[in-house]
Regions:
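Short, Lys/Arg-enriched N-terminal segments with co-localized hydrophobic residues
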Residues: 8, 12-30
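Phosphate-binding/catalytic loops
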Residues: 114, 120-180
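Conserved active-site segments centered on acidic
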Residues: 29-111, 177-180
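Helix N-cap/beta->alpha junction signal
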Residues: 2, 45, 119-120
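Intrinsically disordered, low-complexity regions enriched for glutamine and histidine
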Residues: 2, 21-23, 37
Length: 180
């Protein structure tokens, strides 16, 4: 986000300098821990989690990442990925059967390097649950697609899983590029 410690290049927002500094040890990047967050953890954030896991796997970088997702609300705790979101992932050969929605916890802020929200309401609730963002770890996914002021719309309400898929894919590709 502008003015929050990120550098902008021509295509997307760079990862915070603090993340780069804490991850580089003796010439080797340590494991990158990413938590995707949305309202219920049944559509957008699990789509981002499994898309990112797929991108990382296809890049041969599975051992370098820990990727998960969470909700800001308690409404869907324990539920699987919402069926239309699950079908959209399956169309692209991405399984998500093991997913069970969980809520974001205060200590997730210390556990993860980046906490990526899908919309501004998510960010607001993430700040509240985690007690702030003192290390500039919280960002919107579309910052990494070069669209810092845009949000990934919630297909639970819009019914548009194609647009959500495209936004999630672009955001995750940009995020992976920035981390490498």
């Amino acid at each position: 986000r502008p003015g929050h410690g990120c550098r902008k290049d021509s295509t997307s927002w760079a990862i915070p300098a603090i993340l780069r500094a804490t991850q580089y040890q003796r010439g080797v990047w340590s494991m990158k821990k990413i938590l995707f967050v949305c309202h219920g953890n049944i559509c957008r954030s699990p789509m981002a989690e499994y898309v990112m896991k797929d991108l990382v796997k296809k890049s041969g970088l599975e051992e370098e990442f820990q990727i998960a997702s969470a909700a800001t609300s308690r409404e869907e705790i324990g539920n699987p990925v919402y069926p239309p979101a699950r079908r959209k992932l399956a169309e692209h050969g991405i399984p998500c059967e093991s997913h069970a929605a969980r809520q974001l916890r205060n200590h997730d802020y210390e556990e993860y390097d980046l906490l990526i929200g899908m919309d501004k309401a998510n960010l607001h609730n993430m700040f509240r649950i985690c007690g702030g963002d003192f290390n500039n770890k919280m960002h919107l996914l579309l910052e990494y697609a070069g669209r810092p002021d845009q949000e990934v719309m919630d297909p639970w309400y819009t019914g548009d899983f194609d647009s959500t898929w495209q936004d999630v894919l672009e955001g995750c590709e940009g995020l992976l590029d920035n981390l490498m």
